[in-house]
Amino acid sequence: MRWGCHLPRTSWGSGLGRTPQLPDEHISFLIQWSWPFKGVHPLRPPRAFIRYHGNSADSAPPPGRHGQLFRSISATEAIQRHRRNLTEWFSRLPREERQFGPTFALDTVHVDPVIRESTPDELLRPSTELATGHQQTQAGLPPLALSQLFDPDSCGRRVQTVVLYGTVGTGKSTLVRKMVLDWCYGRLPAFELLIPFSCEDLSSLGSTPASLCQLVTQRYTPLKEVLPLMTAAGSRLLFVLHGLERLNLDFRLAGTGLCSDPEEPGPPAAIIVNLLRKYMLPEASILVTTRPSTISRIPSKYVGRYGEICGFSDTNLQKLYFQLRLNQPDCGYGAGGASVSVTPAQRDNLIQMLSRNLEGHHQIAAACFLPSYCWLVCATLHFLHAPTPAGQTLTSIYTSFLRLNFSGETLDSTHTSNLSLMSYAARTMGKLAYEGVSSRKTYFSEEDVRGCLEAGIKTEEEFQLLQIFRRDALRFFLAPCVEPGHLGTFVFTVPAMQEYLAALYIVLGLRKTALQRVGKEVVEFVGRVGEDVSLVLGIVAKLLPLRILPLLFNLLKVVPRVFGRMVSKSREAVAQAMVLEMFREEDYYNDDVLDQMGASILGVEGPRRHPDEPSEDEVFELFPMFMGGLLSAHNRAVLAQLGCPIKNLDALENAQAIKKKLGKLGRQVLPPSELLDHLFFHYEFQNQRFSAEVLGSLRQLNLAGVRMTPLKCTVVASVLGSGRHPLDEVNLASCQLDPAGLHTLMPVLLRARKLGLQLNNLGPEACRDLRDLLLHDQCQITTLRLSNNPLTAAGVGLLMDGLAGNTSVTHLSLLHTDLGDEGLELLAAQLDRNKQLQELNVAYNGAGDTVALALAKAAREHPSLELLHLYFNELSSEGRQVLRDLGGSGEGGARVVASLTEGTAVSEYWSVILSEVQRNVHSWDPLRVQRHLKLLLRDLEDSRGATLNPWRKAQLLRVEGEVKTLLEQLGGSGH
C-alpha cells in the first residue's frame, strides 16, 4: 500500500516538513541534542532536531552591521516577546498530531523535504501532469538547503525574494512552521526579525484599507516598538508570505498603484504587491509559498529564486521520518482504560518491517514521496498498533488527513464560485474511484483518468479550473504505477484512498443515472411553476366542468413522489451493492480488513508473487467501511468544513437503506474474519442505536483464529459492549489474546453463556480479570474454557476466589494450563467453595498420583460435580488403576476419567480424550503426547487381554487403531 505524511494547519495550511539539502545519492545528517544558541532566547529545554550539513544553524550571518540594529533594551525585549509569542502560536498542534504521544512536538521531530531550484523557463513549459510528475529530481540545478535560499544566484546577484512552490501535500505549511520555530530558537541568525503572514488571513480582510504597520501590529503587538526601525533593517528583515494562492494580486499599475510608505493604508493585496515589487521596504527579504498554478501571479522580474518542494525523493528521508515519528512514546492507555502501551521492541519491529517494505515495494515508496502520505502511514500504523483514543476510527483518520491538507483550500481564489478544492476532487477523483470499485480495478489508463476529469466540461472557464486542479492536486490523489507489468498506468496514491473517495462520491449523492438527472430537472421545474398552475387549474375547474383538469392537477402532485421513489430505489441499490461487497463469499477466507491494511503497509514476509503470475481478484472490503464511517456525525461535520456537506436527511435515508439490507444478509453465519469486518463496519459508523437494531439477532460471536490486537478488542467491545441480549457463545480461541485485551472485552464477556478462551496468552495476571468477571452480578457464563493457557497455580487460586462467589458456571476446562501438583492440590482444598460446578477438566497438567487422588476424592464429595477429567497427567499405572476403581465404584459422586478404559471395557469418554489430542496435536509437546498415548495404548492392550467378550475386544481394537494413527501423525511408532 502507498501512503504519506502531513502536519496540522490551523491557519497555516497543510504539508510537512524540512530537509536541508543533500547530495543526490547520499544523505548526510546528524541527530543531536542542542540548546538554543547562547545568548539567544533560551525559550525551551534542549530538543532533538535534525541537522544536515549546510543548515542555517551553521551558516555565518552576512557581513555588515548584523546584530547592531535592535541593540536598545526596549527593542531587544520586544523582539524577545515576539519570539515567545510566535513559539507559542506555531507550536500548537491539532488533535490529529497529539495522538502521537505527549512528547511529540514539531520542533523535536522534523525532516525537511527536498527543495530543487528551478528556472523561469521551466515554469513556462506546459504542465506534464502525471506522466512525468514523479518524484525524480530533474537533472540540472542542485537541491537547495534552507540556509541557501537567500544565497547569491549563479551570476552573483543578491537574492531578496524566494518563491517556494509545491503541490498539495509536499510540505509547504510545515516547512514554514518549522522555519519560524527555527528563527525563534536562534537557528536562523541571518535574520534579526521575522514577520510571518498567512495570506488566508489577509484575504479575509477583503479590500479594507490597512497599512503595513497596522497589519504587523494587529497581529504582533510587541513589534510596535520596533516599527520605526523596520525601514533600516534591510535584508535582516524577513517577511514570510504563506499560501499566496489565497490572494488575488494585480501587478498592473492601473490595478495597484505604487506605494512606498509602510504607514500608508491600502488594501492588503496592494500592500503585498508593493512589497514584492520592492517599492516598499526594498531591502527586505521575502519568502513566498504557493501552489504551482499561481506562480505566474508574481512577475518573474520580481523573483530572485524559485524553489520546487519535491517531497521525500529519497527513501532514506522517508525512513528517517518514520523512525522519528513512530518512536514517540504513547500515553499507554486505550479507549477502555486498559494499559496497552507499545513497547520499544514492538516499535522497532514496526520500523524495521516498514523499512524493508520501502526497499522492496516501490509503489509505497512512490506514495511516501509526498510527506503528507508519510503522515498517513504513521497515523494508520498508530491506529492499528498503539492505544486507540476513544471514538477514533479509520474513516476519521482519512477525513482528518484531508482536512489537514485541504481545509479552507479553494480551487481558484479569483473565481466567483469560490469552489472548494476538496469538493472538486470528490466529484472528479471520486468518480474515477467509484468506477474502479464497480469494475474491480485499481490500475487506470490515461484515457480513464482524462475521461473522469473532462466529463461534463463545456466552457473555457470550466477548463481553466480543471487545469488548476491538474497542476495543484492531481498528483496528491494519483501516482504513476511503478509495478512490473503495469507501467504506463496510474493508481491511487494509496489503495485505501480509492475506496474512501468512492464511498465519498456515493454519500455525497454525486452518482446519478441519466434518468435521475432528468427527473431532478423535471421536479425542479414543476416545483417552480406548480403552485401557479395549480391555482389556475383550480379556478378554471370551477368555471368549466372539464374532467381532464383534475387529472392534470393530480399529475402535478405525483411527479415529486415518483422522483422521490426513484431516489429511494437508487439508495437501496447502492446499499445492496455495499452489503454484497461486505459479504462476498470469495473473501470469506481472507484476513480481516485490519490485518489486510497492516500487511499493505508493513509488507508480508516471504516470497513475492512473480510478475507473470495471474493477479488475484481485487478486494474492496474497505469501501463499505468507509461508507458507514462517512455517515457518522463527526465525519459529516469535518466534511462540511471541506465544502462537502452531507445533509442530515440524506444521511438518514442512506442509513435506513443500509440497515434494511444488513438486516436481511447480516443474519447469516459468517466466518470469523468476515464477522470482525461486519463489527468493524459498525465501529466506523459510530451509531449505537443503529448497531443495536442490526445486531439484535446475533447470538454467536465466533472470532476463533482472528488475531485480537488492542484495536480489534476495542472494536468488539464498543460495538457489542452496550447490547442487552445474551450471547449463546463467545468463541475467542487461538486469538493471541492477552490480559489487556481480556480487560477491554469485559463488557462483551458479561453477555456470554459459553465462553471459549482456549489457546491464548492468558497468564496468572489475566485471572484477576476472570475473577472479577465471575464475581460480577451480571455474569451469566455457564461454560468456561481456559485450556492451553499458562494460568499456573497462582492463577487458579484467583479463579477459585471467583468460582466461590459465582452461581452460573457449571463446566470449567483447565486442560493444559500448567497447574502442576500445586495447582491441583489447591483445587482439591478449595473445590467445596463452589456448589454449582458439574464438570471439571484438569487433564494434561503434570500432576502426580497423590494430588490427582486427592482431587478425585474431593470431586466425589462435591454436591454437584458429575465429571472430572484427569487423563494425560503424570500418573503411574497403579495410580490410573486406583482412579479407575474410584470412578467405577457405585457410591455415587463424580465420575473420574483418567484413561481410555474402564476396567476391561472402553471408556465412554474415549472419543472426548482422543478429540482433545487431535485438536491440540500441533500445539502440545509431541514427545510428551507420544509418551502419554503409549501408556494409554498399553492400557488398551492390557484390557483387551483381560477380557473374553468379543464385542469389547472389537471396541478395544478400534480405539487402539485410533491411538496408533495419532502416534503415526506425531512421528512415533504405534507398536
UniProtKB/Swiss-Prot annotation:
Spans annotated as Required for interaction with MAVS: 75-556
Keyword Nucleotide-binding: yes
Range of residues in the leader sequence: none
GO CC annotation terms, alphabetical: mitochondrial outer membrane; mitochondrion; plasma membrane
Record: transit peptide: 1-86
Domain remark from Swiss-Prot or TrEMBL: The LRRCT domain mediates homodimerization and LRRNT mediates trimerization of the dimers.
The protein's name in its UniProt record: NLR family member X1
The organism of origin for this protein: Mus musculus (Mouse)
Classification of source organism: Eukaryota, Metazoa, Chordata, Craniata, Vertebrata
